[in-house]
Amino acid sequence: MDAQSTKDQGPEGADAGTLSFTYHIGDMFEDAPENCLLIHACNSQGHWGAGIAKAFKQKYPKAYTAHNKFCAKEHSKTQPVPTGSAQLLAPVDSGSQHWIGCLFTSAKYGKAKDKPDAIVKNTTASMSMLLELVRMADGEVSEIRMCKINSGKFGVPWEKTEEALKSIILQEGWREKIEIWEP
C-alpha cells in the first residue's frame, strides 16, 4: 500500500525558523531511503520493550545493543542518561542504512514513566540536541522520519508534543523538515 501524505496544517504566518512537518499514513520503516534518520522517543534506561521501540529493536538489533550499552553500561544507576538529551546512532545493522534517533523524553517506562508535562518539556530539549547532532553529522542524513512520538506508551496526546516541537527555534544548520508517520 502506498503511503499517503498531507502538508502541515500549522498556523498561518508561522515563523520560518521552526520545524515543518508533513504527515504520512503508512509504515515509516518501509521504503525509508538510505541514510534516512528514524526517530522515536524512549526511556533513559535503554529498554526498547514495547510500542514502536520494540519494532526498532526487532528491525535494528545492533543499534539496540549499542543503545542499551550506552544507557545501561556507560551510565550508572546513580548517573543515568539525562532526560531531555538525545542519541544519534549511525547505521550499524546489515541490510539497513538507517540512522536511529533516540529522544530521551522519560527517565523510566511503564507505570513509572514521567508525567506528561515533564515528557513534553523533555521533548523540546531532546529534539534540539538531536538536531544539533544531525548538523554535526555533516550531511550524512538524507531525510528525517518520525512517528507521533510520546503518543503511544508514554500516553501524551500528540497535539501537546506537536505544539512543543513547533516551539523550537531552529539554529543555523539544523534541519527544518520532518516527516511524521502513523500506521
Curated annotation (Swiss-Prot):
Substrate binds at residues 26-28, 41-43, 48-53, 149-155. Belongs to the POA1 family. Residues 8-183 form the Macro domain. Highly specific phosphatase involved in the metabolism of ADP-ribose 1''-phosphate (Appr1p) which is produced as a consequence of tRNA splicing. It comes from Phaeosphaeria nodorum (strain SN15 / ATCC MYA-4574 / FGSC 10173) (Glume blotch fungus). It catalyses: ADP-alpha-D-ribose 1''-phosphate + H2O = ADP-D-ribose + phosphate. This is ADP-ribose 1''-phosphate phosphatase. Its EC number is 3.1.3.84. Keywords: Hydrolase, Protein phosphatase. SMART domains: A1pp. One of its GO terms (molecular function) is phosphoprotein phosphatase activity. The lineage of its organism: Eukaryota, Fungi, Dikarya, Ascomycota, Pezizomycotina. One of its GO terms (cellular component) is nucleoplasm. The keyword Repeat does not apply.
